[in-house]
């Protein structure tokens, strides 16, 4: 435990580019089974900022970002429905998210965050319900690295595809 803490402390203080290089080399030498493909060095540099404060070892990184490098994510309709919501609430939230994200021309973190937060606030939707539903639909995880940056990295097309996939799952 002490060694994990020390290693985590070292990784958190490491230069982002150096950590990205270490991760890229580690994944190249020991491909994680969680990833359908190994991220490029440029992709690795982009995701390091999402996970640097969460990992204790290089091996810890892949589970946090697996959703970014999976061809398909799998879940059931029951898993998509957040606590405190029902089927219709979840469908409405995901449909609204599709509409909001589809209308963002400059698809980057700040615009994504502003659009989703503003909509939830103006429509008196609990932010946790709204963002939790979106998070699970695109990551198949209850917790993930920074949601808005993750959406930016996934890209508009893949994000919208995953939201549509979640809506189809709820409709079946």
Cite the ranges covered by each PLM segment:
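Non-catalytic, well-ordered alpha-helical scaffold segments
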Residues: 1-4, 17, 45, 49, ...
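Core structural elements
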Residues: 1-9, 53-56, 125, 136-141
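Short helix-capping/linker segments at secondary-structure and domain boundaries
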Residues: 12-16, 59, 140-146
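Small-residue-rich helix-loop
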Residues: 16-123
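Charged substrate- and nucleic-acid-binding regions of tRNA-handling and nucleotidyl-transfer enzymes
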Residues: 110-170
């Amino acid at each position: 435990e002490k060694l994990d803490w020390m290693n985590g402390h070292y990784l958190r203080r490491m230069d982002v580019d150096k950590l990205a290089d270490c991760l890229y080399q580690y994944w190249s030498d020991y491909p994680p089974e969680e990833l359908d493909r190994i991220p490029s060095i440029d992709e690795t540099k982009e995701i390091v900022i999402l996970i640097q404060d969460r990992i204790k070892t290089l091996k810890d990184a892949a589970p946090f970002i697996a959703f970014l490098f999976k061809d398909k994510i799998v879940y059931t309709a029951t898993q998509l429905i957040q606590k405190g919501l029902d089927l219709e609430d979840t469908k409405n939230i995901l449909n609204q998210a599709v509409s909001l994200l589809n209308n963002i021309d400059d698809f980057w973190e700040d615009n994504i965050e502003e659009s989703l937060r503003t909509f939830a606030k103006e429509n008196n939707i609990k932010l946790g319900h709204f963002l939790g539903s979106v998070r699970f639909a695109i990551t198949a995880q209850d917790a993930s690295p920074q949601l808005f940056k993750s959406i930016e990295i996934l890209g508009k097309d893949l994000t919208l595809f995953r939201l549509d996939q979640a809506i189809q799952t709820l409709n079946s």
